[in-house]
């Protein structure tokens, strides 16, 4: 995805909101260090800054009102987070957060899924995460596969914004959590192909596939 496409495309604010909430939670101090190294601690405190809090409120309002964000703004947020030493855990938490929110919107996930065949539960889990993936590929392609279970994305913001596979952990976690919520557990999910590593697509599959 080119810089021009990022500037023109619009995406849902939900991903940006989840990412900033995860960033904020990661930066809440668990203890006070008297001899704190400011240079070391400053990057970790970004999530507690007034700018981040203001953007959380803005993204939440946009989400409630059905608004959108420029894809460029979301891509720049991914770039910012990817430079943190704890980037992988922040992306992972955001992915789980998004899957949880998606399931709540559909209501009663666990109760509905309990009596359904495994294949139907798997399809429901994939449908939930594919919606998240499409928010991250406004000018790309997203598809899912049932046998073996898989999520394939081409031209998404994740790898292209981060220029690595760190941001792709967001969908890694979202897929894993979505399948758990629909009781279609496949175990750990692996990111077997990555555009950020030079592959043609980003592909996620169960580690045992």
Show where each model-derived region lies.
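Beta-rich nucleic-acid/ligand-interaction surfaces
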Residues: 188-208
């Amino acid at each position: 995805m080119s810089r021009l496409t990022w500037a023109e495309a619009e995406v849902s604010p939900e991903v940006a909101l989840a990412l900033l909430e995860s960033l904020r939670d990661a930066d809440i101090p668990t203890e006070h260090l008297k001899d704190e190294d400011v240079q070391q601690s400053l990057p970790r405190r970004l999530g507690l800054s007034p700018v981040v809090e203001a953007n959380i409120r803005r993204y939440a309002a946009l989400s409630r009102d059905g608004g959108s964000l420029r894809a460029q703004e979301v891509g720049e947020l991914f770039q910012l987070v990817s430079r943190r030493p704890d980037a992988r855990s922040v992306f992972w938490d955001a992915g789980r957060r998004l899957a949880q929110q998606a399931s709540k919107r559909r209501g009663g996930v666990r109760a509905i899924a309990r009596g359904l065949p495994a294949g139907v539960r798997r399809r429901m889990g994939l449908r939930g995460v594919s919606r998240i993936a499409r928010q991250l590929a406004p000018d790309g392609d997203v598809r899912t596969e049932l046998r073996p279970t898989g999520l394939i994305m081409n031209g998404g913001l994740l790898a292209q914004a981060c220029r690595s596979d760190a941001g792709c952990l967001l969908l890694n976690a979202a897929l894993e959590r979505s399948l758990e919520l629909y009781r279609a557990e496949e175990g750990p999910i692996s990111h077997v192909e990555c555009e950020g590593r030079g592959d043609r697509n980003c592909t996620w599959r169960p580690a045992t596939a």
